[in-house]
Amino acid sequence: MGPIIMSGYIADHNSWRGGYLAVSLIQFSLVLILLVTLPLWKRVAASRELERRQNGEYVEYTEPEERSKVNVLGIKGVKPTLIAFLLYCGVESTVGLWGASYLVGVRQITAETAAGWISLYYGGITAGRLITGFITLKVHNRILIRCGQFITIAGAGILLLPLPDAFSLIGFILIGLGLAPIYPGLIHETPTRFGKENSAKLIGYQMAVAYTGSTFLPPLMGVIATKTSMILFPFLVLFFLVAMLLSAEKVNIVLGKRKQAGN
């Protein structure tokens, strides 16, 4: 949303100061809303934890005195979760960094239009996060993550098809909307899936792997484009998205087997 607001102020008023002020006011408003609604978040978290315990979804792996001895990477389901984090951040960065180059070089769209469309891709992520923030009160994170992944794959599929240029914009927006619930959903599910006592250490690993994806996958796209052509951009994005879906579903399968074994 920030790039869209800033570009609008620069285009209409030839000044960045108004855009800077508008973004600052939005950020302060969000902070105020979060502070006011903190009690609500705590009540929702407590009720959700109670519901998961009653449904047998909450699993504790160790007693408190054994926490330091646990190898979190050895817990079943952790490794495919880390792969999903790596691919998520890699895809988000790759689309943001190379999407405009694909639009200009392959779709023959002007640089100004391409930049605006990529801003709308980020706008899709922002809008998706706002929407899922409310939906998550009623819908399980696992469902949101899965739906988001299917939406991203649909968006990448649109980029692959020989459709009019306007459909490329739809594809980028769908990818942004689909990506929105995945990252926060995976983070939020960590204590439930792998135990509260393991979550702090495991989230640290998840952050490290996520930044690794942001660091290395976009340059990989650049190397591939240099050696071949930017026409491969949607194919590579689709490959990453499908691999992320398979990794996330692998975790669900492992958790399902564990729940059945517990019963």
Language model regions located:
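Interfacial helix-cap and linker-helix signal at transmembrane-aqueous boundaries
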Residues: 4-14, 103-104, 135-136, 221-229
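Juxtamembrane intracellular "pre-TM" segments in multi-pass secondary transporters
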Residues: 45-81
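Extracytoplasmic gate region of multi-pass secondary transporters
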Residues: 74-119, 123-126
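Structural signature of the two symmetry-related core transmembrane helices
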Residues: 143-158
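Paired small-residue
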Residues: 155, 166-174
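Intracellular juxtamembrane helix-capping segments at the cytosolic ends
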Residues: 181-194
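A late C-terminal transmembrane helix in Major Facilitator Superfamily
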Residues: 193-230
